Regions:
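Rossmann-fold dinucleotide-binding core
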Residues: 1-79
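Metal- and O2-centered redox machinery and metal/ROS homeostasis
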Residues: 6, 10, 144-147, 199
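Alpha-helix boundary/capping residues
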Residues: 12, 53-54, 108-112, 157, ...
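Solvent-exposed, flexible loop/coil residues
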Residues: 28, 64, 74, 124-127, ...
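Generic hydrophobic, helix-prone segments enriched in Leu/Val/Ile
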Residues: 37-39, 99-103, 183-190
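Short, basic, helix/turn surface patches
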Residues: 44-55, 129-131, 175-182
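Helical "substrate-binding/catalytic lid" subdomain
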Residues: 70-176
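Short, basic/aromatic-enriched C-terminal tail that caps enzymatic domains
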Residues: 172-199
Length: 199
C-alpha cells in the first residue's frame, strides 16, 4: 500500500539513505511482454539505468507511494479476478452445479473459461504471499474512502488455497497437467477441513 511504502521511506531516510518507491507489473524478463517497473519518489529517474529491452522503467510523479499505488490498482484487478474465479468455481462445486456452470461458461463466455483453466489450477503455489498483497490492496482503497471488503475477501480466498494440499508446490514444481476440476476438488477439501475444525 502507498501508506506502507511511506512508512518504509521514513525508516530508511531517517537512517540516512535515499528511498525510491517501486512497483513491478508483469512476468519476469524474457517473456513475450516485458515487465514494467514503476518508480516514484525523490529523483526516480535514477533507476532508469535498469531499463533494457526486456524490462521497461516508468517514472511517476506523485512522490513516494505513487509507484506502489499503481501496483495495487493493477493487482486489485488481476489477482482479485483470480480469487473471484476461484470463489465461483468452488461455490458451484459446493452447490452441486460444477458441470452446469462449466457448460454455461463454455456457451456464453468461452474466453473466460479458457482463462480460468489456464490459471486457477496453479494459484495455490502463490496463494500465501498473495494473501498479504490483497490486504495491502484493501488498505490502499480504504485510505481513499473505498471499501476494503472486496480484497479482504480476496485475501480469505488465497488463505483457503494456502491451506490446501496444493500449496506445497512452487511455480516450478506445480503439476501442469492438473485440471481445473482437480484443483477445485483440492480447494473444496480445504474448505471441508475448515468446517470440521470449526465444528
Amino acid at each position: 500500500a502507498p501508506a506502507t511504502s511511506r512508512t518504509i521511506a521514513d525508516i530508511i531516510e531517517t537512517a540516512g539513505a535515499d528511498y525510491i518507491d517501486g512497483g513491478i507489473i508483469g512476468m519476469p524478463p524474457g517473456r513475450k511482454n516485458p515487465p514494467r517497473l514503476y518508480v516514484s519518489g525523490d529523483r526516480p529517474e535514477r533507476l532508469e539505468v535498469l531499463a533494457r529491452p526486456d524490462m521497461i522503467v516508468r517514472t511517476l510523479d506523485g512522490g513516494v507511494g505513487a509507484a506502489s499505488a499503481i501496483k495495487m490498482c493493477y493487482a486489485a484487478l488481476n489477482k482479485g479476478a483470480m480469487t473471484l474465479e476461484t470463489l465461483v468455481l468452488v461455490g458451484a462445486a459446493q452447490l452441486g452445479l460444477a458441470s452446469e456452470l462449466r457448460r454455461e461458461l463454455a456457451d456464453a463466455q468461452p474466453q473466460t473459461l479458457e482463462r480460468m483453466e489456464g490459471r486457477v489450477p496453479w494459484l495455490a503455489a502463490d496463494a500465501e504471499r498473495w494473501s498479504g498483497e490483497m490486504l495491502e490492496i484493501a488498505r490502499t482503497f480504504a485510505d481513499v474512502g473505498l471499501t476494503p471488503l472486496i480484497h479482504e475477501g480476496a485475501a480469505e480466498i488465497f488463505d483457503l488455497l494456502a491451506d490446501s494440499s496444493l500449496a506445497s508446490e512452487t511455480r516450478e514444481t506445480a503439476n501442469r497437467s492438473r485440471t481445473i476440476e482437480e484443483a477445485v476438488a483440492a480447494f473444496s477439501a480445504s474448505l471441508s477441513a475448515r468446517a470440521r475444525d470449526a465444528a
